[in-house]
Amino acid sequence: MKNNKTSSFNSINHPSMPILNTQKEELLLTPLIPSSNSYLSNVIEELGNADWVKSGLGYVNDTRCPFCQGDTINNDFLKAITDVFDETYELRLKDLKDIYNDYSNSCDEYIRELEHSLFDSGYVSDDDNIWGMIKQIGQSLELNKNALKEKIEKPSAAISLIDSSINYDEVNAKIKVLNGEIKEINDRLNAYETSIYNITSKL
């Protein structure tokens, strides 16, 4: 395509890469601790298994305990466990899930828009090294999405995301080079077409 001198090329747009604000980053770094307003709180804290207990609540079936598989569950015990994970805990957990969904969608949209812009330019060849750069960014974003999943599954964990700004800057620099080449070709084409028009208009 680069050797095609009869048609112009579209410039490449580099969309903004998804990032989390400081407040969201702090939430990821902060262990989500269950409430102390339950007689079971100290026991769970000593065991260090709040995440395990929280996940087990989803498997409660009538009186059968999901932890020991015995018929040991009654309403008082179930309320005591539920009280460990109070409204504040549930709201923070919902915040984490919202962060994951928004970040995951933004990552997918970023890669999709970038690839579309490269294809739409009509200039970038399949073997251009920019595709490898995009793959690296995609891999780092995928690792971040997995880290956010881990935070949801283990709210007591403290996590931080990989800084992909270096990869982003490399892609940005590459796109500037490609756009410079595209502009040069388009300028030459426009100059050629202008010359042809001037010549033919005088005939």
Language-model regions, residue ranges each:
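"flanking P-loop NTPase cores in genome-maintenance ATPases
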Residues: 1-62, 69-203
